[in-house]
Every structure is written in structure tokens, then in C-alpha cells.
Amino acid sequence: VAGRFAPRSTPGTGAPGGGSGSPTTRTTVRGGHVPVPAARRAAADGTADMRQRSWTPPEGHGPLDLGLVLGPLRRGPADPCFRAGRDGSVWRTCLTPLGPGTLRVRASGPAAEAQAWGPGAAWLLDELPALLGAEDDPAAFVPRHRLLAHCAHRRPGLRLTRTGRVLESLIPSVLEQKVTTDEAYRAWRLLVRRYGVPAPGPGPEAGMPDLYVMPEPRTWALIPSWEWHRAGVDDKRAATILRAVRVARRLEEAVTMPPPQARARLELVPGIGPWTSAEVIQRSHGAPDEVTVGDLHLPHIVGYALAGDRDADDAAMLRLLEPYAGQRHRAARLILLSGHAPPRRRPKMRRTDISKW
């Protein structure tokens, strides 16, 4: 499901249009909500290779809420590929089909002002509308529960992003398999900073964060076994990533397929199952019906929110979401964003740092 657990932030820092008076909790962050401060005057960029684009959503699009739309792409508060700036901008790096690129996007009234750098700049700007949810249709969602109606009303800026890239969501999703989110975030951060490339852009003097572009498939394939171990990644997850990067081109082709066929292609790779494929397709395709199954917490949260059943399993969750066929992922995200989760009654999953073995 979009987003993962992160520390609580101070109440009143919610994204514009997303109920800014509500605190950001672990559950709402898991729903894909990244606090983005109100926009301020932008700093001078001062770089010759910058490309720019302004995009205004069509009438009826709703408010442009960068924190809600782009939040699912962040892998922890120190993600080396994603950062929310103090000036209200969002920075994101991407290994595009044309090469590395850096995107900075900022809401300016009803419009989005974007700048991009690097070989992938043109591709990033071409894909900007899809990234900001232009291909999503929130009107197709009809709430059948009071909780969902309330949350949808409070989050009018919720649109599903479509990145058009597979590997950038697949690798961190594999790292999140069967471990705590802190462990997965740490592994992603260490591996990207060590084997990725510094993000193209104007540099820190223009307010650019210290960002990296994820490694190319060949670079992932050449990471030594001891470096996976040092990052806390066990052999099973490392082997899954290595199998995936060997067929990276075929996996990236999945963005041209309908979501069910795309998931089937991803699941041909041993180690990639329904949980991982759903996490990827939600982001790469902006697919509103790709609900995550096999998750440790989501069935309990959905069951508790819709039926008061904190012990619901996947089958019960899917039954409860049947009225939202075609929009089940959106329904699950709204539930997570509502913060309506069962009280914890057992300890958190124990963290196991295999790098110390």
C-alpha cells in the first residue's frame, strides 16, 4: 500500500487540501501522505541545462495536493530519491528511459510549476501530468461507508500518481518484504547512495537537496554479496532483485500493459508475488483497483474501519471491499489516510540487523 510507517510529525503540517489541521500519523503516512509546507518564493536555479514546464489541471481536477499525490513515492524521510522542500516544492529523481533526471515541482495557485535537469529532463516534463494524477478519475469512486465519504471529502486533492517506471518501485518493494520498514528504508538509502549517481541539478546553493538517482540495472547486478549483507538485505531478497534486474527491459515493458497483465509479468520473476506486484502497479500505473494482499497490517486496518473486525484476513478484507470493485486501492488508501486503525495489542515486529552477523 502506498507509503510506509514513519515517525509522527507535528500537528498542523498536513499538505494543502488534505486536511491541514490533522496530525500526520503512522497510519496516514502509510496511506501516502507526505507533509509539504505551503509554497514560498522559489530560489534562483542558476543552471544552464534546466528545462521548465507549467501545467494547469483541467477544470474539475480538484486542488493540487503534492503531498497526497506524490507521497507514495517516498521511501522514508531520508529517501535519497525524494525530498519535500521547505519552500513547498517536491524534488524527485528518476532513472528515465533517456537517462538520469531530477524533477522539482511546486504548486503555484492552481498550476504546477516544474523544472527538470539531466538527460531525462524532457521525459520527466512530458510525464508530469500523469505523475500529478491527470489520468486518474476520482469521480469513479462512490463511497458506501460514512468513514470513506468523510475522508474523501477531507482529501479532495487525492489523485493516484502514475510514474510510468517499474524498477524504481519494484526494488524498494522487494526490500520491504518480510522486514520492518526501518530496515527496508535503511537498505534502500545505503544502496542508492553507494551505487547510484548524484542527481543532476543546480546544486545546494540553489536549494537543491542532496539527492541520488538509483543505480542502473547492470550496476545492481554487480553489487557484491557482502554489500547486500552490509545493507541488511538477506540472500532471498537480494536474489529476487538480481533476477529482476536481469530482465529489467521486459519488466519496464509492463507499463504499456493493463494492470492484470502487468502484474502477471512481474510475478513471473521468482520472489515477486501478489504483495510486491500490487505495490509496484499502484505506482507505475496509478491503478485504482490494485489492492495489496498478503500484507501484515492492511486486512486488520480495513476490517476494523469498515466492520469493527480487527482480526480480518485477506479474504475478509476483499469481501468488505467488494462494493468498491474497480476502486479498491483508492478505498484502502482513504482508510489509511483516515488514521482509523485498531489499537496495537502486540509488540512491533522485531528488527533483525543481519549486517552484524
Annotate each language-model stretch with its function:
Residues 4-26, 30:
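Low-acidity, Ser/Thr- and Arg-rich intrinsically disordered low-complexity segments
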Residues 30-357:
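HhH-family (HhH-GPD) DNA N-glycosylase catalytic core used in base-excision repair
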